[in-house]
């Protein structure tokens, strides 16, 4: 075999090796084993909800043992619901950490797109003048696992479990229109306001609450004189501090409520619905508070 043929054969061998194995070395002792990663979602009652469609998209940041970002992965709703594994192979690190966040809004994705270190990863609510936009149905989770070396055979499959990071709130205020009218003439557009707060506005990538205090404006509708809010989502409070629901009229805070009539505080529970019912009719203020499963609004008797 002449030199030209030997060269061609050598090149072909290298190409074939590259096709069937990601590691081209004299032996496999330093080769990382490929593996697959899946995402699994849980609700607050530890029920597997991966296939329900609750997760619309997931961004997964991959960090090495020093906290340096080495990869960024995206999954859509169909991939998550089908439990589709992502094939991966990382040569170099001894361990990797997968930091997964589900359902971030476009603003959050843009803010985190160029993060290069885990300590710089934050999921911050959009806000104006201390009033935050309600977050999406956020989930997150972290998985740290070793990188297996010494073979090109398939390594151990891995699963990153993600959990809800927000609470839901639903508000009903009976007699709201009459209460407003009793507190002065109606002067649009800013004659009244309802604010709920306060919570931190930021999660770290590792799901620790930090940042500035913000409130939320539960823009609802007045139906038959009653205020009924949509279901809003909020970040949890620090140290189970209760939320305060503040009712304003004509620029003045007229009511500030943080507990039910029985003393139960307005504490948002991650992965649950906080129901606040306020009756402004009659001589005495009546406030009911309850916690129900996610997406389940408490039904109150009409009287």
From Swiss-Prot:
Gene3D superfamilies, sorted: 2.60.40.2100
Lipidation (N-palmitoyl cysteine): 23
Subcellular location: Cell outer membrane
Keywords of this entry: Cell outer membrane, Lipoprotein, Membrane, Palmitate, Signal
Protein name in UniProt: Major fimbrium anchoring subunit FimB
Organism: Porphyromonas gingivalis (strain ATCC 33277 / DSM 20709 / CIP 103683 / JCM 12257 / NCTC 11834 / 2561)
Lineage, uppermost ranks: Bacteria, Pseudomonadati, Bacteroidota, Bacteroidia, Bacteroidales
Reported function: Anchoring subunit of the major fimbriae. Regulates fimbrial length. These filamentous pili are attached to the cell surface; they mediate biofilm formation, adhesion onto host cells and onto other bacteria that are part of the oral microbiome. Fimbriae of P.gingivalis are major virulence factors.
Additional free-text comment from the UniProt record: The name (major fimbrium subunit) does not indicate the abundance of the protein, but is derived from the greater length of the major fimbriae. In strain ATCC 33277 and strain ATCC BAA-1703 / FDC 381, major fimbriae are 300 - 1600 nM in length and about 5 nm in diameter. In contrast, minor fimbriae are only about 80 - 120 nm long. This length difference is observed only in a small number of strains, including strain ATCC 33277 and strain ATCC BAA-1703 / FDC 381, and is due to a loss of function mutation in FimB, a protein that restricts fimbrial length in other strains.
Secretion signal span: 1-22
Name of encoding gene: fimB
């Amino acid at each position: 075999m002449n030199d030209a043929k030997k060269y061609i054969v050598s090149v072909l061998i290298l190409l074939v090796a590259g096709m069937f194995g990601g590691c081209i070395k004299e032996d496999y002792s330093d080769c990382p084993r490929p593996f697959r990663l899946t995402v699994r979602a849980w609700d607050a009652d530890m029920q597997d909800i991966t296939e329900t469609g609750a997760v619309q998209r997931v961004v997964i940041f991959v960090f090495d043992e020093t906290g340096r970002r080495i990869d960024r992965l995206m999954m859509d709703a169909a991939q998550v619901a089908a439990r589709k594994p992502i094939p991966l192979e990382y040569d170099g690190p001894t361990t990797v950490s997968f930091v997964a966040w589900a359902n971030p809004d476009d603003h959050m994705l843009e803010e985190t797109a160029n993060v290069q270190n885990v300590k710089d990863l934050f999921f911050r609510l959009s806000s104006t003048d201390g009033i935050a936009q309600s977050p999406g149905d956020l989930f997150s989770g972290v998985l740290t696992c070793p990188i297996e070396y010494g073979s090109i055979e398939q390594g151990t499959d891995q699963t990153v479990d993600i959990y809800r990071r927000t609470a839901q709130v639903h508000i009903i205020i009976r007699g709201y229109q009459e209460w407003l009218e009793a507190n002065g003439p109606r002067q649009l557009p800013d004659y009244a306001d309802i604010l709920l707060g306060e919570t931190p506005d930021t999660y770290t990538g590792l799901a620790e609450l930090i940042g500035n205090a913000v409130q939320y404006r539960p823009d609802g509708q007045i139906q038959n004189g009653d205020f009924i809010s949509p279901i809003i989502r909020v970040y949890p409070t620090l140290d189970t501090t209760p939320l305060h629901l503040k009712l304003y009229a004509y620029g003045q805070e007229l009511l500030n409520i943080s507990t039910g009539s029985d003393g139960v505080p307005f504490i948002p529970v991650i992965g649950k619905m906080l129901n606040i019912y306020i009756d402004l009719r009659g001589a005495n203020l009546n406030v009911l508070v309850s916690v129900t499963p996610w997406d389940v609004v408490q039904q109150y008797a009409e009287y």
